[in-house]
Amino acid sequence: MADQLIRAMAAEGGIRAVGVITTRLTEEARQRHKLSWVASVVLGRTMAAGLLLASSMKTPESRVNIRVQGNGPLGEVLVDAGLDGTVRGYVNNPTIELLPNKIGKHDIGKAVGNQGYLYIVRDIGYGYPYSGTVELVSGEIGDDITHYLAKSEQTPSALVLGVFVDKEGVQTAGGILLQVMPKVAIDEELVQVLESRIASLSGFTSLLHSGKTLPEIFQELLGDMGLNILPEAQIVRFKCDCSMEKVLRALRMFGVDELQNMIEEDKGAEVTCEFCSQLYQASPKELTQIIQDLQQPSTEVPLGQLRRSSH
C-alpha cells in the first residue's frame, strides 16, 4: 500500500479517527540517515505521530514539531510534519543499536529513555505557535504522545504506532489515532472502549504486513459505531525544504574572517542538513561572493535616523 493518510468519523461525529501508512517514507529516512534498526523504529514512530497530529490542523501552512529529549543513548529525536502530508526528522545518534528486550522486540524505551521531556509545537503559519511540554512516560513515543494529548491539549485519545524493520529494511510502518471530540469527552465509558480497542491492535504492524488496509482496520475498530470513512486519501512523503540558497544564507552568519579561513584552509565549505542528511558544498567562489556582499555598505537606515513624516 502506498504511503497515505485517511480520515474518518464515528459515533455521530463524536469520534475522530486518522490512520497513516508511512512505510516508504520511513525507509527513505532510514537510508538517508543510515539508521540502525532501533533508530528506524523510533524515528518512524515519531514521524507517523507527527503526520497524525498535523492532520487535525486547519490552515494549509500548518506544521507540527515533535521533540523528544530522553536520557537514553539515542539522544534527541526531532520531527517536523505538515498538514500538506510532508514530514522530515532525525535522531542525534542514528547508529545506536541495542539488544532486544525481554519479549524479543526492539527496546525503544531504553533507547529513548523514560526520563526527560516531550515538546510539541503547533504552528498555523501566522507567527503565533502553540507549544506544550510533558514529562516522558515510557519513552515508547506512543504512550508519551497520548499522555501529552490528555494533559496538554485535554483531548482523550488512543494511539498506536508501529514500525517493522528487518535486514531488508522497513517492511511496514504507520499509526492510528482515535480522539473523542469535546461534546462527548465526558463519556468516560466511550473513552475506555476506545482505549481497549486500540490496545487490541498490539499487532498493528503485523496486520499491515499481512495486507490489511487502513479502512479494514478502521472497520474492526469502529464498525459498530456508525463509521464514516472520508473518501479522499492524502499522499504523505518524506520531504525537506533545505536548499543551496538557504545554506549560502546561513553561511553569512560566520562573518568575513571565518569565511576567509574556509577558503584558505578548506577550499570551500561543506554543510549537511540535519533533517535529511543532504550534503551541500559551497565553492571558494561562492564564499568569496558572500564576503563581498558582507563588505558592502549597508543601505538600511539606522534605527536612530528613522523619523516620522510630517504632514
From Swiss-Prot:
One of its GO terms (biological process) is protein refolding. GO terms for molecular function: protein folding chaperone; unfolded protein binding. Its main location: cytoplasm. The keyword Cell membrane does not apply. Coiled coil: none annotated. One of its GO terms (cellular component) is cytoplasm. Disulfide bonds join 240-242, 273-276. It is found in: Cytoplasm. Under oxidizing conditions two disulfide bonds are formed involving the reactive cysteines. Under reducing conditions zinc is bound to the reactive cysteines and the protein is inactive. Keywords: Chaperone, Cytoplasm, Disulfide bond, Redox-active center, Zinc. It comes from the Bacteria. Redox regulated molecular chaperone. Protects both thermally unfolding and oxidatively damaged proteins from irreversible aggregation. Plays an important role in the bacterial defense system toward oxidative stress. PANTHER family: 33 KDA CHAPERONIN. Belongs to the HSP33 family. This is 33 kDa chaperonin. It comes from Trichodesmium erythraeum (strain IMS101). The gene is hslO.
